[in-house]
Amino acid sequence: MNSIIKHLAIATKLLNQPVAEEALAANVARDRNLNANIQSLSEVLRSYGFENHISRRKLVEIPSLAMPVIIILHNDEAAVVSEVKGRGEERVYVIRQGDAPAHEVSHKDLEAQYLGFCWFIKPKLTADHRSEL
């Protein structure tokens, strides 16, 4: 779960509205084993001004316009997909994992690690009421 929190923080930074990993971790509810609750984490993101939802879908079904998106990987790992190049099974994904620099991964390689869940996140749009026009 810590990997997911870290990658949600990276995604907020890519959206130019950074929320520190520590802030997310501190505000999320935990169970008896101190594991973070996914629903609580979603609510914390909403409180920071982000619309978000988890979706079960195939890797090729993730829209390239929805970037950045957090993908859930095997072994309690996660990654942020910041860009998608190509189409179908010829796709190449630009991913960020932890503190490593962004790198490209083929569809075949990423699909072998992908659990089938992705977390979409974007800033909430709010009306600007500063002008009378």
Place the predicted regions along the sequence by residue.
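Glycine-rich, N-terminal phosphate-binding loop and its surrounding beta-alpha-beta segment
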Residues: Y48-E51, L59, L73-N75
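Cysteine-nucleophile protease catalytic domains, especially the papain-like/related folds used
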Residues: M1-I54
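Noncatalytic regulatory segments and standalone regulatory/sensor domains
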Residues: M1-I10, A29-A36, I62-L133
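A short, surface-exposed loop/turn module that caps and links secondary-structure elements
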Residues: H53-L65
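An acidic, carboxylate-rich microenvironment
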Residues: A23, S40, V60-E61, D109
